[in-house]
């Protein structure tokens, strides 16, 4: 019984990514990157003049404020950008 319990604990630890980090899309959404530690948000950056085409995507630690020229959209799930 102890062996079974130990086996289940080991399998659980292996299956769970204990050092889990966020995965965010790159500019072309077919490709993504694993974010470094501390950067737990994904973002898209748009030019205000054209809100349909993002000009940059990636990982970030804090969502920047929008400006008169640039709009940011941030999210906190894998590949949400």
Swiss-Prot record:
Family matches, as PROSITE patterns: SNAKE_TOXIN
Gene Ontology MF: a single term: toxin activity
Gene Ontology cellular component annotations, sorted alphabetically: extracellular region; membrane; other organism cell membrane
Signal sequence, renumbered to the chain: 1-21
Main location: secreted
Pfam entry (one): Toxin_cobra-type
Disulfide bonds: 24-42, 35-59, 63-74, 75-80
Places the protein is found: Secreted; Target cell membrane
Tissues showing expression: Expressed by the venom gland.
GO biological process: killing of cells of another organism
Highest taxon of source: Eukaryota
UniProtKB keywords: Cardiotoxin, Cytolysis, Disulfide bond, Hemolysis, Membrane, Protein kinase inhibitor, Secreted, Signal, Target cell membrane, Target membrane, Toxin
General function of this protein: Basic protein that bind to cell membrane and depolarizes cardiomyocytes. This cytotoxin also shows lytic activities, but 2-fold more important than that of CTX-A2. It binds to the integrin alpha-V/beta-3 with a moderate affinity. Inhibits protein kinase C. It may interact with sulfatides in the cell membrane, which induces pore formation and cell internalization and is responsible for cytotoxicity in cardiomyocytes. It may also target the mitochondrial membrane and induces mitochondrial swelling and fragmentation.
Entry similarity comment: Belongs to the three-finger toxin family. Short-chain subfamily. Type IA cytotoxin sub-subfamily.
Subunit structure: Monomer in solution; Homodimer and oligomer in the presence of negatively charged lipids forming a pore with a size ranging between 20 and 30 Angstroms.
Protein name (Swiss-Prot/TrEMBL): Cytotoxin 4
